Amino acid sequence: MNLQQQLAYCQQHQQRLQLRHFDNETAWQLGEKIKRQAEKQGVALAIDITVNHQTLFSYAMAGTCAENQDWLRRKRNVVELLSTSSYAAGLMLQQRETSLDARYGVSLRDYAALGGAFPLQIKQAGIIGSVNVSGAPHLDDHNLLLQVLADFIGLPIGSIELLTPLTPLSA
């Protein structure tokens, strides 16, 4: 899958993975679902769900460390800045051959355009926050969020195209 294809999929994901409503109880249910999926996949994650700058769910699985919390913060900041997934932001920067600090003047100590943060979007209302994970390779973090969000909103298994590592464009 090349860069253009991945960007197109990221746009589709953000359009399709929208919720009807979201509250504190929803955050708890979603956070628990992420934890269970991580356990099934044998990966230790730090998990954070933030709405309007308030943390509604936070959990650090055994095997994570403070560094994972920092990655959560940095990825979440990208979603808040650009209103797109942290993975899609990284792809857009690659496409434009630039970086977060060069394009937006932000510190890379505070922002990371790597997979693992996804906007929480309410249908017909917009983005209210983000769901964020850290602990696996960043593409795996991103795909885990896609899988869980799709299942959480009741989309059929396999209806969301998971992303694969980038392949160069053929000449």
Swiss-Prot record:
Family matches, as SUPFAM superfamilies: GlcG-like
Domain of life: Bacteria
Signal sequence residues: none
InterPro entries, A to Z: PduO/GlcC-like, PduO/GlcC-like_sf, YBR137W-like
Family: Belongs to the UPF0303 family.
HAMAP family on file: UPF0303 (MF_00761)
PANTHER family cross-referenced by the UniProt entry: PTHR28255, UPF0303 PROTEIN YBR137W
Full protein name: UPF0303 protein YPK_1581
Species annotation: Yersinia pseudotuberculosis serotype O:3 (strain YPIII)
Upper classification of the organism: Bacteria, Pseudomonadati, Pseudomonadota, Gammaproteobacteria, Enterobacterales
